[in-house]
């Protein structure tokens, strides 16, 4: 069946594209500023490193929430506590709501006795930083920093199933003040 789109629908699509472009620009501008604050250096262009599939890789079923948001399930702790998270390419921080992540139920959690406060382009969260085992698609990383939010900061997301943000960005963009090896990306290299 053919459908004819009118000028109003085209404007709506353009508004969405414009809004999405502004979101991406703001995200990367914030990342560049955080990188500079953490390292004292300006970001450079990708250094041309050849990427190859690592032995510690797996596959994960992802669901697209909207045009720029991917959602999937990870496990935190021992035994693993399943968490549905939004993957965040703009930060290495992992932040989970307190009603979902229970460090006292994990044999491998450690309270760093350190607080955090982060603001994303939407939700903000504050709480305590722990380290624990994190497993994504069968790839296990130890001693990963997890911000356990003192509130359910993701409560505005659809269906109420998303309990946190899972950072996949460069460790130098982090705001937890932990060593690179305590981010998920850093820990998988060990």
Residue ranges and their predicted role:
Residues 1-190:
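Non-catalytic N-lobe/flap surface of aspartyl protease domains
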């Amino acid at each position: 069946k053919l459908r004819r789109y009118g000028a109003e629908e085209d404007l709506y699509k353009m508004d969405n594209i414009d809004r999405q472009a502004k979101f991406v620009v703001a995200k990367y501008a914030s990342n560049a500023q955080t990188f500079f604050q953490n390292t004292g250096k300006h970001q450079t262009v990708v250094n041309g490193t050849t990427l190859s599939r690592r032995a510690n890789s797996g596959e994960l079923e992802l669901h697209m929430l909207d045009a720029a948001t991917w959602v999937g399930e990870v496990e935190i702790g021992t035994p693993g506590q399943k968490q549905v998270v939004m993957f965040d390419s703009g930060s290495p921080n992992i932040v989970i709501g307190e009603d979902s992540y229970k460090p006292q139920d994990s044999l491998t959690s450690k309270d760093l006795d350190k607080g955090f406060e982060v603001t994303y382009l939407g939700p903000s969260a504050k709480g305590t930083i722990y380290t624990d085992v994190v497993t994504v698609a069968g790839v296990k990383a130890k001693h990963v920093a997890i911000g356990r939010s003192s509130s359910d900061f993701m409560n505005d997301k659809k269906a109420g199933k998303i309990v946190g943000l899972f950072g996949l960005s460069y460790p130098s963009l982090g705001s937890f003040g932990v060593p690179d090896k305590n981010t998920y990306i850093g820990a998988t290299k060990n």
